[in-house]
Each structure stands twice: as structure tokens, then as C-alpha cells.
A protein has these predicted regions:
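Rossmann-like dinucleotide-binding domain that binds NAD(P)(H)
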Residues: 197-304, 388-392
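The feature captures the short pre-catalytic strand/loop hairpin that immediately precedes
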Residues: 195-202, 348-352
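N-terminal Rossmann-like dinucleotide-binding module
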Residues: 2-72
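Alpha-helix termini
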Residues: 16-19, 69-74, 112-124, 173-178, ...
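A contiguous active-site-proximal alpha/beta segment in oxidoreductase catalytic domains
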Residues: 126-197, 215-218
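C-terminal glycine/acidic-rich active-site capping loop/insertion
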Residues: 8-12, 247-269, 277-279, 283-286, ...
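Short, well-ordered coil/turn residues at beta-beta hairpins
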Residues: 98, 295-296, 310-313
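Beta-loop-alpha module in the N-terminal Rossmann-like domain of NAD(P)-dependent dehydrogenases
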Residues: 18, 75-146, 163
């Protein structure tokens, strides 16, 4: 059983010495919210690394997240007053960027500034999805990280989900090897809406559900269609058709609900899409045209978050639904209790027959992706996904927005993509009227 962080400190193994001897990686988090905490949960299955730092613009939230890491026994984490201070600490070898989209460029600027002024050294940076709010910002993030000469990784958890990885590996090894490559992949992420106000605000987040969640699905379908061991570049996006809508949250009663529960969100004036779909035509290096279908929603009301993926080929198929988790609980109407998310993320009910995702950090891929990038930054593996891949995801998303706005299929990449900003992000999008 591995000694906990406090035990290591009592016996003289400081975070600094652990980090500098090359055997362990000291990791600092930018961001203290929901996403950072999922990573920390996943860290219980990560070897050779400790969560040692947290920075957030809200110092109380940073301290709370650091305390949470200590309670999980994944590192002797502490809160830092600035990103520069965290980078300057010799205990910190790598940064995980998990904060809000609107702060992405600023956060990376602070990291690189500290490095270039000689305040500290890092082995790598891992950045959450989406890489940025638009192509121009994504390119700036990539430029900054490359200017610092750092190894980099793009955090897309669903690519590392065990069901996705196992299904992909088996279908390619058994089905594709004997009857031909797969030709259609589908992926979806659906729930009833985000936790915090900035997600709902197009100007801050960079869009609505397409930007927030289709970033998962467009990479999952491409990953499934790519032969294991081959780079993503062997399956290239060529044409994109997309659609966006506000199906639920522009209805008057739900506009009022958002205004009441999400501070500063007014969908009567500045709505975002709560549903999006796309069809992506890919060309493969072996001469085939293959398809990826994606959909995503903040207007899905079921037991909770539902992730799904499919891969189809000439004589085989796979299907995954995260709510088919095996464990189910039933509570009669006599069972009373507070609302929560103890059964599944974005949980919508506490009675009836409910699925339980017993270890969400594993099921959604957080544990495996964190383990992978730790090993990358320790020189033991090559990154499966880099910020270059994150940039291409943003390019696909912006093309999807442009396709939806123009109502037509677009070649990828369309001209002028670097300067494109979705109407949702500019606050000028008007969805079809919902209700009387």
C-alpha cells in the first residue's frame, strides 16, 4: 500500500526531493472546480505523481480543492497565491490547466512568463478541452506553449474511457483485420445543463453546448475510425455539416429558471444553443471516405449524464452507453432525501429505478488520461494527444458553427476560419421562437 503524502513528509521525503529525483511528478492545478476535482478523483489510480498545488482566482476555492486532494490522499497539495508562484516552486514539475475557457490564454501567458523570467522549470503542460474559445485563441495557446519548449498534452477524457479503448481495440483486431476497416462512428454527450453560470454565457464560454461538449464527440469519432497505432492524421476531416438549436432553455419558463439559478444568465437576450449535431466526412490514408456523426445536448433529461459511442464496419459493430453501468438502485416514493449527484453526474432524480456509475473518474476516462500524461512527462510514453490535436478540434468546432449559421455543408477548413467567431459567442444569435 503506497504511503500517503503526509507520511512521506514525516519521513523526510519532501515534495521537492520527490519531484527533482525524477521518480515522481509534482503536479499543480490551474482551476479548483468540478473538472479539477474529477481529475483528483482519478488520481487515486495514478502512480509516480502527486497533486501538490492548486491555483484559482478565488483563494477560498483553491484552498478547498487543495484540502480535497489531501483528503483523497493523492498529494500534499497546497493553495498558491498566483500561477507564477506555483510555477516557481521546485516541487511543481507539470501544470494541469482546468479553469474556465475565457481565462485560457491569460493562464498560459502567466505560465510562460514565469518560465521565461527564470522563476521555475516545468516538464510539461496538460490542458483541458476545449483548447480555447476560437481558432485564434487556440493558436495563441499553442504558440505560447511551444515558445517555452514544453512537452504538452490535450486532456480529452473520453478517448481514454475503458469501454471506448477496449471496444476500439477489439473491433480493429478482430473485425477490421478480416472484413475491412470501419466506416461509421457515432458519439454523443447529453445532460440537462452545466453546473456554473459561465458555461451558459456564450461570450465567456465561446459558444453553447457545441463548444462545451461536442469537442468530446468530434475527437472520439475520429479516434474510433483511426487504426490503433496510427496517427489521427491518417483520418482527415474534409467536409462538415452541422445544426444548432435552442430546444428547451429558450422556452419562457426555462429562461426564468436560468435567471433565478444561474447568476447573470439571461436567455431572453443572449441565448446559447442547447443542442447540436454534426456529420463529418473523413478521408483515410487508405483511400476510403468514412463518416462521423456527433450530437450533444443540454436539453436531455434522463437519470443523468449519458455518454454514448458506436463504431460500425462491414461485419461488426460496437455500442457503449455510460448509463448501462450494471448497478441499479430502486427507491420508492417513501424514500425522502436531498437532491445530489451521488449516483451519476448531472443526476436528475433520487427515486425510482436509477443507474449508478460506481467510479465515474474511471468510467469517463479521467484516471487513464492522467496516468498516461504523467508517464509522458516522466519520459516513459509519447503523448497520444497534444495541443496540436486540440487546435484541430477547435477548427472542426468553428467550422461546425459556420456550417450551422450558413445552413450548408462546408469544406474543411473553410477560408477565414482564424477570424471566425460564432454568433452565439458574439451575442447575436437568435434561435427560432419557443412557445407562445
Amino acid at each position: 500500500m503506497r504511503p500517503n503524502a503526509a507520511s512521506r513528509l514525516r519521513h523526510g521525503a519532501s515534495p521537492t526531493s520527490n519531484a527533482l529525483n525524477g521518480n515522481r511528478l509534482g503536479v499543480g492545478f490551474i482551476g479548483s472546480g468540478f473538472n479539477a476535482r474529477f481529475h483528483m478523483l482519478g488520481w487515486k489510480g495514478v502512480r509516480d505523481a502527486d497533486v501538490l498545488g492548486v491555483w484559482s482566482p478565488d483563494s477560498k476555492r483553491a484552498a478547498d480543492a487543495a484540502r480535497y486532494a489531501n483528503e483523497l490522499d493523492v498529494g500534499a497539495a497546497k493553495a498558491y497565491m498566483s500561477i507564477g508562484d506555483m510555477v516557481a516552486d521546485p516541487a511543481i514539475d507539470a501544470i494541469w490547466i482546468t479553469g474556465p475557457n475565457q481565462a485560457r490564454v491569460e493562464n498560459v501567458e502567466e505560465i510562460v512568463d514565469a518560465l521565461q523570467r527564470g522563476r521555475g522549470t516545468l516538464k510539461g503542460i496538460a490542458c483541458e478541452k476545449p483548447l480555447a474559445r476560437n481558432v485564434a485563441e487556440a493558436k495563441e495557446v499553442l504558440r505560447l506553449v511551444k515558445s517555452a519548449g514544453l512537452m504538452h498534452g490535450y486532456l480529452e477524457d473520453q478517448v481514454f474511457a475503458p469501454q471506448v479503448e477496449a471496444g476500439r481495440a477489439l473491433l480493429w483486431a478482430r473485425g477490421a483485420a478480416t472484413t475491412g476497416r470501419p466506416y461509421l462512428a457515432r458519439a454523443a454527450e447529453e445532460h440537462s445543463g452545466p453546473h456554473t453560470p459561465w458555461f451558459w454565457q456564450g461570450a465567456l464560454q465561446g459558444g453553447g453546448v457545441l463548444n462545451d461538449m461536442m469537442c468530446h464527440s468530434v475527437l472520439v469519432v475520429r479516434h474510433l475510425l483511426t487504426k490503433p497505432g496510427n496517427p489521427l492524421a491518417t483520418v482527415k476531416p474534409k467536409r462538415i455539416t452541422a445544426h444548432i438549436a435552442s430546444l428547451k432553455w429558450s422556452r419562457p419558463e426555462y429562461v426564468a429558471k436560468l435567471a433565478k439559478t444561474q447568476a447573470g444568465v439571461d436567455y431572453s437576450k443572449h441565448p446559447s444553443e442547447d443542442f447540436a449535431s454534426s456529420t463529418i466526412e473523413f478521408e483515410t490514408d487508405d483511400g476510403y471516405t468514412v463518416l462521423g456523426e456527433t450530437s450533444t445536448s443540454w436539453s436531455y433529461v434522463g437519470a443523468g449524464l449519458r455518454l454514448s459511442a458506436e463504431l460500425l464496419g462491414p461485419e461488426y459493430s460496437m455500442a457503449w452507453n455510460s448509463l448501462d453501468a450494471g448497478l441499479k438502485l430502486f427507491f420508492s416514493r417513501e424514500v425522502k432525501g436531498r437532491a445530489g449527484e451521488d449516483l451519476v453526474e448531472k443526476q436528475n432524480a433520487e427515486t425510482g429505478l436509477m443507474p449508478v456509475v460506481a467510479n465515474e473518474a474511471v468510467a469517463y476516462g479521467y484516471e487513464a488520461e492522467d496516468r498516461h500524461f504523467v508517464r509522458c512527462f516522466l519520459g516513459k510514453e509519447t503523448p497520444l494527444l497534444t495541443l496540436d490535436d486540440g487546435l484541430e478540434v477547435v477548427q472542426v468546432l468553428m467550422t461546425a458553427y459556420q456550417s450551422a449559421e450558413e445552413g450548408r455543408t462546408l469544406d474543411f477548413p473553410p477560408p477565414g476560419l482564424d477570424a471566425f467567431r460564432p454568433a452565439v459567442a458574439r451575442g447575436t444569435w437568435t434561435p427560432p421562437r419557443q412557445g407562445a
